[in-house]
C-alpha cells in the first residue's frame, strides 16, 4: 500500500496541513462545533438564502415530483425544462444572449478554456483562483500572470497582433480585493482582446449603483454592460444559497461550450429540485432587496468600526475581509485565539495564497448582527495590539 506519512508529517510541521471540522450550520452566522454554539465569519452564504423557508419548500416540492437526482448528463436526459428556464431567466436578468448552467464554478472555468486551442495566450492576475489557473494548464494554453491588480503590468502582455484572453476574478476570494473591470474593458477595446470575468463573489451582492439592475453583479457596479464582456461566470453557492454555477455570453459561445465543454458533457446534470430552488432564490432576490441592503449595512458598519479602531486591513465595499499575518504558525495561533473567544474565522495559508501571505479571512453576511461584528472587531483589536508590540 502506498504511504504518504512523511509528506503529511512535513506539511504538519511546516504549518500547511489542511484539516476539516465537523460543523452544523444554524445559519450563515452561527454554527455548532464540538457541541458549542459559535459566531461564524466563514460562510459565503452572503444573503443567508440557504436557510430561506420558501426556497427549501420549493426544493421539497420539486423533489417530491421529480426525485433527487437527474440520472444522466445534460446531453443524454439530464437537461430538464427547469434547466432550460433557468438559463433563459439568467440571460434575461443579465441582458445577454445565452447562458449555460453547470455543476460548479470550477467546472465553469474548466469548460470555458476547453473551447480554445493551445495557440491562445491567457493573461491572469497572480492571485487568481485556482480554477482560473488550472483551466489554462489542463488545456495547455500559454499563461502570463501579472502583478496583483496591476493593469500597467497587465498591458505589457497584450499584443495588437494576437487576440489575447484577459481572465480575471471580479472579487478575489482570498483577499476581498476588487478588480477595476472598467480598466480591463478599456484594455480589451484597445488591443481587441477577449475579456472573461469570474464573478463568483460578486453575483447577487456587488454594490450596484444602477436602478435598472435586475440582479446585482460586478460588471454593473462599474457601469459596464454585460454584452461587452465575452464570457461572464457566476455561482449559485454563494449569494443564491444553492449549488451550481453558470457561464453566459453570446449564443455562439454557449453553443461551443455544449460541443466542447468536457466537464459539462461528461458529468451528471444538477438535480431538477436544485434548479427549481435556484430559480426561486433568484426571483426572491430580484424582487426583494432587504437582505442585500442588510448585508451592505453590515459591511459599512464593519468598515467604520475597523477604521475607528485603527486596525490595518483593506476595507472594500465587499463582504470578504482579510487580516495579514505572514506566517502559517502565527496564523493558526491567531485563529485559535478567535476560537477561544467563541468566533470562527479561517486561516488562509500556502498554497492557497503565496508563501508569506498567510492571513485570517473573514466574511460578512446579512445574518450577522452589530453585536456579532463588535465581538469580532474587539477580539481583532486585542490581537492587533499584541501583534504591534
What would you call each of these model-derived segments?
Residues 2-6, 10-66, 162, 193:
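N-terminal "arm"/small-domain region of PLP-dependent enzymes with the aminotransferase-like
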Residues 119, 124-168, 290:
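PLP-dependent aminotransferase-class I/II
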Residues 45, 144, 148-197:
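Active-site phosphate-binding strand-loop segment of PLP-dependent enzymes
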Residues 293-300, 307-342, 352, 357, ...:
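Conserved PLP-binding catalytic core of the aspartate aminotransferase-like
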Residues 192, 213-236, 255, 259:
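Conserved active-site segment immediately N-terminal to the catalytic lysine
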Residues 57-104, 299:
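Conserved N-terminal alpha-helix of the aminotransferase class I/II PLP-enzyme fold
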Residues 53, 57-61, 65, 88, ...:
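PLP-dependent enzyme catalytic core of the Aspartate aminotransferase-like
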Residues 231-233, 240-289:
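Conserved core segment of the aminotransferase class I/II
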